[in-house]
A protein has these predicted regions:
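Bacterial Sec-dependent signal peptides at the C-terminal "C-region" and cleavage site
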Residues: 3-4, 8-24
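Short internal beta-strands
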Residues: 102-110, 192
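Glycine-rich, charge-decorated loop segments at or immediately adjacent to ligand/cofactor-binding or catalytic sites
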Residues: 115-119, 190-212
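Glycine-rich oxoanion-binding loops at beta->alpha junctions
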Residues: 120, 124-154, 166
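Glycine/threonine-rich flexible loop motifs
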Residues: 163-175
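Conserved anion/nucleotide-ligand pocket segment
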Residues: 212-283
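Glycine-rich, aromatic-lined ligand/substrate-binding cores of catalytic
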Residues: 255-332
């Protein structure tokens, strides 16, 4: 049945235009960046998303297609027909080695170079068994910062990793640590840019730096709407690197991309973002990570539903199970009752706004206000300010909360403009 659905979907999508001409990723522009690597020891910062040109065969969809209602819920990696393997590649690492580039190290972020570790799970350094290149984890018990010995291994850092444009999505934090170190040690940084799937809007409060953490390290809005290349330019230009240093930075932009596009990715950027709909909902449903309500980790649809064992008045139910990417999900093997967002129209999700109605709705169906938010400050680390928790618990209208951060969003929208590489 899935094969039939995929075949029909693929046929219908052929009738739709892709994102402009075809978006050319930074990693495809060999003529621009290979000359920069000549005679250099090169370290790469990447993970499974570093597929050159987002090439994939055997999947229902193609990278770069305009996202539609029909395609938004198609799981990454679902084959176009039963028994047909989905093949990705080649990866940037393999291409560089094939072209004779001296790749001396790999830096890996949260979830690891292979992208299999759970959210927040520490990842050890190792040697890549395929290539023999050392993988230096920057999400380990040892350090979140590169060591001096790591910096001695390379002359130039090459970045190719898929981000989703949210302040609490940690890949940019690791990039910031690497840029800090490269600025201090005089190393070059080259970023091979990629589209931001949430790059079509800016929303949320600017981070109050008292809540600076591993899930929020820059004074930007929750949804910043920038690619990693643009964000790196802003870090450099605004003096946000450690000791206000600036690094020797080159960004290789995408071609034919604008911030108005909704382009399909080919791989989950992290284990629990399993389709495009989850990536769009994530800016609103990830807030449940700071509450006692689950956002669906341990199901096939994380961040596309939410619930709690005590919300028994809701008609929808699901049961989190242990699975890759969610080995110990909250409420494992317990029936949770809640809300299914999988049929929510994209037009509503693409409203250009963080949706706080989900939080307000969940609070209204919990047996006790005191049992809603976690006792720690995880929610504040996510949202970046103290007043959202207070106003949600006081049951203030969500538009009143949004109005409170409107000036932040407007100010950041203007502040970032000199660093944009693509049309808004």
């Amino acid at each position: 049945m899935r094969g039939i659905v995929c075949s029909l979907l693929a046929a219908s999508l052929l009738m739709l235009s892709s994102c402009s001409s075809r978006v050319v990723l930074g990693d495809e522009r060999f003529d621009v960046y290979l000359p920069l690597l000549e005679g250099k020891r090169v370290a790469i910062y990447s993970n499974p998303s570093g597929i050159v040109g987002d090439k994939v065969e055997g999947w229902c969809l193609k990278g770069g297609q305009e996202v539609t209602e029909a395609s938004a819920g198609v799981p990454f990696g679902q084959p176009s027909a039963p028994g047909h393997p989905v093949v990705y590649g080649p990866h940037l690492l393999d291409v560089l080695l094939e072209k004779g580039v001296n790749v001396s190290a790999i830096f890996s972020p949260e979830h690891g170079f292979r992208g299999t570790a759970d959210a927040g799970e520490l990842v050890s350094s190792e040697v890549d068994p395929k290539t023999g290149v050392p993988i230096l984890s920057l999400y380990s018990s040892h350090s979140m910062m590169p060591e001096a010995s790591d910096m001695d291994k390379f002359d130039l850092l090459l970045v190719d990793i898929q981000d989703v444009g949210l302040r609490y999505y940690t890949y940019y934090v690791t990039m910031q640590h690497l840029m800090d170190a490269c600025a201090a040690y005089g190393k070059q940084v080259v970023i091979l840019d990629r589209p931001n799937p949430n790059g079509f809007y800016v929303d949320g409060p600017i981070l109050d730096m008292q809540y600076k953490s591993g899930i929020g390290s820059l004074p930007v809005t929750m949804v910043h709407g920038m690619t990693l290349g643009e964000l790196a330019l802003m870090m450099n230009g605004e003096g946000w690197l450690q000791d206000s240093l600036r690094c020797d930075l080159t960004v290789v932009p995408c071609l034919h991309y604008t911030h108005r596009m909704h382009c399909t990715l080919i791989l989950p950027p992290s284990p629990n973002l399993k389709d495009m709909r989850s990536i769009y909902l994530y800016s609103s449903t990830c807030f449940f990570e700071g509450t006692e309500v689950t956002a669906g980790r341990g199901t096939q649809w994380p961040f596309e539903l939410y619930g709690h064992p005590d919300m028994e008045d809701r008609g929808f139910s699901f049961t989190p199970r242990s699975m890759p990417g969610a080995k110990q999900p909250r409420y494992r093997d317990q029936v949770c009752f809640g809300v299914d967002l999988r049929e929510k129209p994209l037009k509503e999700i693409w409203s250009g706004q963080i949706n706080l109605e989900y939080l307000a709705d969940a609070l209204a169906h919990m047996p006790s206000d005191s049992a809603f938010f976690m006792k720690n400050k995880h929610f504040e680390f996510q949202v970046g300010v103290p007043y959202v928790r207070e106003m949600i618990l006081a049951r203030r209208p969500v538009e009143e909360i949004r109005e409170k951060w409107k000036a932040d969003a407007d100010r950041f929208r203007e502040q970032r403009r000199p660093y944009l590489l693509y049309r808004e």
